[in-house]
From Swiss-Prot:
InterPro entries referenced in this protein's UniProt entry, alphabetically: Dxylulose-5-P_synthase, THDP-binding, Transketo_C/PFOR_II, Transketolase-like_Pyr-bd, Transketolase_BS, Transketolase_C, Transketolase_CS
Quaternary structure and interacting proteins, as annotated: Homodimer.
Pathway: Metabolic intermediate biosynthesis; 1-deoxy-D-xylulose 5-phosphate biosynthesis; 1-deoxy-D-xylulose 5-phosphate from D-glyceraldehyde 3-phosphate and pyruvate: step 1/1
GO BP of this protein: 1-deoxy-D-xylulose 5-phosphate biosynthetic process; isopentenyl diphosphate biosynthetic process, methylerythritol 4-phosphate pathway; terpenoid biosynthetic process; thiamine biosynthetic process
UniProt key word Magnesium: yes
Keyword Transferase annotated: yes
Catalyzed reactions per annotation: D-glyceraldehyde 3-phosphate + pyruvate + H(+) = 1-deoxy-D-xylulose 5-phosphate + CO2
SMART domains tied to this protein: Transket_pyr
Record family assignment: Belongs to the transketolase family. DXPS subfamily.
Manner of cofactor binding, per the entry note: Binds 1 Mg(2+) ion per subunit. Binds 1 thiamine pyrophosphate per subunit.
The protein's name: 1-deoxy-D-xylulose-5-phosphate synthase
Gene3D superfamilies xref list: 3.40.50.920, 3.40.50.970
Top-level taxonomic group: Bacteria
Amino acid sequence: MDLTQIQNPSFLKDMSISELEGLSEDIRKFLIEELSQTGGHIAPNLGVVELTIALHKLFDSPKDKFLWDVGHQSYVHKILTGRAKEFGTLRQYQGLCGFPKRCESEHDVWETGHSSTSLSAAMGMALARDLKKTKEYVIPIIGDGALTGGMALEALNHIGHEKTDMIVILNDNEMSIAPNVGALHNVLGRLRTAGKYHWVKDELEYILKKIPAVGGKVAATAEKIKDSLKYLLVSGVFFEELGFTYLGPVDGHDYEKLFETLQYAKKTKGPVLVHVITKKGKGYKPAESDVIGTWHGTGPYKIESGDFVKPKEVAPAWSAVVSETVLKLARTDERIVAITPAMPVGSKLEKFQKEFPDRMIDVGIAEQHATTMAAGMATQGMKPFLAIYSTFLQRAYDQVVHDICRQNLNVFIGIDRSGLVGADGETHQGVFDISFLRHLPNMVLMMPKDENEGQHLVYTAMQYEDGPIALRYARGNGLGVHMDEELKAIPIGSWETLKEGTQAAILTFGTTIPMAMEAAERLEKAGVSVKVVNARFIKPMDEAYLHDLLGKNIPILTIEEACLIGGFGTGVVEFASENGYHSALVERMGIPDRFIEHGSVTKLLEEIGLTTDAVVDRIHTMIPSKQKRA
């Protein structure tokens, strides 16, 4: 079948099971081929082909509302709703988004990117439906990994209490990104092997009521028997206790069983949870055999071999520099523990986990819990290293404020994927952390200019015992610089002059330092002398350095790959104003006041005007005397 000719899912209504099975093969082949060129979330989508087709066949989108938790598994949904022809642009600038996008299709009723939000949003839609007295199905699809998130459990509790009509699809592949952890995962494991409790209890009631005269009474008396049967057949039926009708587990790759179960769910009043067992990566051997999450989301790859197509790496990944330095220090300090919310592979903590399994804690998709747990460990003299992506740290903001900073606890937060991350787009850009951490009392915030300084700042953080300290580091690789063998502590709040200059100054840090240095060199050739400063401590700032610099009365440009509002540049302007300097001398470059879409980091930087050319032009406009343009 030519998938690019699909306009909407209505064609599925008249297809036979054998035809649907052929469509499944076509979709898997299409995904494997297309994603080999663009990269993307290949394994999750290969696992939900039959489930997605079954949902679109039996329900009527967009009237009936599908909410894809996290959203990375929505590619099949996009194909069935007329977007197959756009897959060549997947996750590219102004191309097809890798997550549901409301402006992209009327079938995308809820935007996602972070986990565990679908149930709460579905509850809101269902309540709105009931208040408006309309009739449509609301169907959140959530994975077993996302179900470990506290927000999802809060929503389950509320939905079950209110007895709201809703069909929750639990897509259980025993794996979110990395293997799942936690007691709820174990409950699901028991359910997988328990068989279909709900079918048995309903058939029992039907048979009892067929007995003449006494059948109804026997059936009523049997209610307690059914409750006992529930525990006998389904050990630990968590969802029934919350007020859901539990259906399953059902084979998520068997159309007959999917249709039977979903049709039953459609007729059932109140909240229903359909437990679907799927195989992540189904249909592509390298993805099927992956047990650690390598094929969850990938770049381009070679279909035949399963080898990833990667540029030759000339420098270590930032995540590896940080995690391996923490591991090195942990060998001589038993107080150091590493904590991750379900991202051990992404944060490069596999080596730490292998060497110190008792001191490596993966809490699952539970950022709030991870953060407060780290605080609790710090009260007992441990040195917790909390490795967390910038975008996911947003989810633990109150815990950082209330539990870490307020108590001034020695927690080292490694803020991975800081700055623009590219293809994952709006939901994953790490551009807000400076603004929401800089104003917190007791917080120290740093970002290194290269991987050598990065390892020294990790050492600095582990030596620091006066409160919380956080290190920002980017996605991708470092610069390939020489790495010192001996680690050293860098004085807290100290900046570094990278290039002397007399006519203007650039204050920046991290990934924008090469941009600033290149701009300064070009300006130098044009006769403009520009100082470049490595402002590696975003907080506290080097106040002595700032006093000296502002006292020279020269233009100052701050550059940051983070949002301007409340950012580093704002801090410099505030310092100038509060200390009687001419704050108009300070201008800022950074992320504007909007969400940044998906695309390559290079393209996105060009789009927002954060380039070497833009820096050169800005410095020219800031210097009063006319200069030859570089």
